[in-house]
Structure formats: structure tokens, C-alpha cells
Amino acid sequence: MKIIVVLAVLMLVSAQVCLVSAAEMGHSSDNELSSRDLVKRFFLPPCAYKGTCNH
């Protein structure tokens, strides 16, 4: 059963990578957008964009 869980996690991770790479290719004309910004956009909660997170 653990193998199934590992495969599911790998599929989710690869799907996120595909989303990031697709967004990166779609915005290739904008040099301002880096892969780090895209990762933040996908993985950070919405409050991070507004600066209201309590860290």
C-alpha cells in the first residue's frame, strides 16, 4: 500500500512541475517572471501576496 501512496505523491509533484513549466513557457516574453516567482505563486497561501501573513 505504501507504493501506491508514493506513486500518488510523485504524480502530484510532477503535475505541479508541469504547471510551473507551462506557466514559465507562457510568460517567456516577460523577463520579470522568474521560476522562483512562479513557485511562490503556486505554493504560497493567498495572504502571502497581500503581505498579511503572520510569520
Curated annotation (Swiss-Prot):
Expressed by the skin glands. Disulfide bonds join C47-C53. GO terms for biological process: defense response. Keywords: Amphibian defense peptide, Disulfide bond, Secreted, Signal. It is found in: Secreted. Residues 16-41, 54-55 form a propeptide. One of its GO terms (cellular component) is extracellular region. The keyword Protein transport does not apply. Residues 1-15 form the signal peptide. It comes from the Eukaryota. This is Riparin-1.4.
